[in-house]
Amino acid sequence: MDIVEEYKYLFEPRIRKRGRLYFYKGTVEDVCVTGNRITCRVKGRKRYKAGVRFYPDHRPELSCTCPFYQEWNSNCKHLWALFLYIDTMVAEGELDYGAI
């Protein structure tokens, strides 16, 4: 399962580009998988908490504490960085996407 391909439609290209930079800089920290919810902290100028909850049909419920998400209710670079991290966890066998 390619998480990135499945959910990229939720993010504007410019947001994906910026999130990819955050991911490759190693700013995704403190990742916690609890049942069907995955949370992390993403370090930039400030640290923000990003999270995704997957429903049984794999529909995601997203949240982030950054101003962009809070003010515009729009998916942000922190969330895309988290999706890239989740994709890596699945690819490396650290997470069974079908089980969440």
Q: Model-derived features: where do they sit?
A:
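Long, low-complexity, compositionally biased intrinsically disordered regions
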Residues: 1-100
